[in-house]
Amino acid sequence: MAAQGEPQVQFKLVLVGDGGTGKTTFVKRHLTGEFEKKYVATLGVEVHPLVFHTNRGPIKFNVWDTAGQEKFGGLRDGYYIQAQCAIIMFDVTSRVTYKNVPNWHRDLVRVCENIPIVLCGNKVDIKDRKVKAKSIVFHRKKNLQYYDISAKSNYNFEKPFLWLARKLIGDPNLEFVAMPALAPPEVVMDPALAAQYEQDLQIAQTTALPDEDDDL
């Protein structure tokens, strides 16, 4: 039995991507999750319980954050085992972090075959964007969802979680009925830039994929 008020529906979410892409910054935006996080010493990870209130009741994502281990090579299988969903993050101001996305995806699906995965391009608030919408095609080849995000401004924070919740519950009409308490924005996402990026993504989605066989 879940404790009183404890969400019955829980999912293990693994957050992966190169070091420095903003994974920890992203997960720390959710204030109650940050307050209630637990450290798993055996694996060297922090687990943040992020609760979202939906029209079908509360859902909890137990988000596993690597605490920077990925800087020392790959992650151990124990990190991935029993994951029910994942977010792969790269930094839109760093091309190499996008180039490494296929490696993270490969490690993930080797252990967790058919889980829903969201690809997130973080730091879109920074004007000097290197990885443009038209170059982001990996998700289309692998049937993942993609979102531009800006962790420091809270831009699109809830989008990956809403998409994953709909997939995991099997209800495309699932909605968040209240936003979780988020840390105040450290930067402001320019609304004109956000609108431009959304338009760029829509155009990119309808563009034919390049023919080359490489993963990117």
Swiss-Prot record:
InterPro entries: P-loop_NTPase, Ran_GTPase, Small_GTP-bd, Small_GTPase
Domain Small GTPase Ran-type stretches: 7-171
Keyword Cell inner membrane: no
Cellular location(s): Nucleus; Nucleus envelope; Cytoplasm, Cytosol; Cytoplasm
GO terms, molecular function: G protein activity; GDP binding; GTP binding; GTPase activity; magnesium ion binding; pre-miRNA binding; protein heterodimerization activity
Superkingdom of origin: Eukaryota
Example GO biological process: protein localization to nucleolus
Swiss-Prot/TrEMBL catalytic activity: GTP + H2O = GDP + phosphate + H(+)
Cofactor(s) this protein requires: Mg(2+)
Annotated region (Interaction with RANBP1), positions in chain: 211-216
Annotated Gene Ontology cellular component terms: centriole; chromatin; cytoplasm; cytosol; midbody; nuclear envelope; nucleolus; nucleoplasm
Complexes and interactors: Monomer. Interacts with RANGAP1, which promotes RAN-mediated GTP hydrolysis. Interacts with KPNB1. Interaction with KPNB1 inhibits RANGAP1-mediated stimulation of GTPase activity. Interacts with RCC1 which promotes the exchange of RAN-bound GDP by GTP. Interaction with KPNB1 inhibits RCC1-mediated exchange of RAN-bound GDP by GTP. Interacts (GTP-bound form) with TNPO1; the interaction is direct. Interacts (GTP-bound form) with TNPO3; the interaction is direct. Interacts with KPNB1 and with TNPO1; both inhibit RAN GTPase activity.
PANTHER family referenced in this protein's UniProt entry, alphabetically: GTP-BINDING NUCLEAR PROTEIN RAN, RAN GTPASE
Main function: GTPase involved in nucleocytoplasmic transport, participating both to the import and the export from the nucleus of proteins and RNAs. Switches between a cytoplasmic GDP- and a nuclear GTP-bound state by nucleotide exchange and GTP hydrolysis. Nuclear import receptors such as importin beta bind their substrates only in the absence of GTP-bound RAN and release them upon direct interaction with GTP-bound RAN, while export receptors behave in the opposite way.
Family, per entry: Belongs to the small GTPase superfamily. Ran family.
Protein name: GTP-binding nuclear protein Ran
Originating species: Gallus gallus (Chicken)
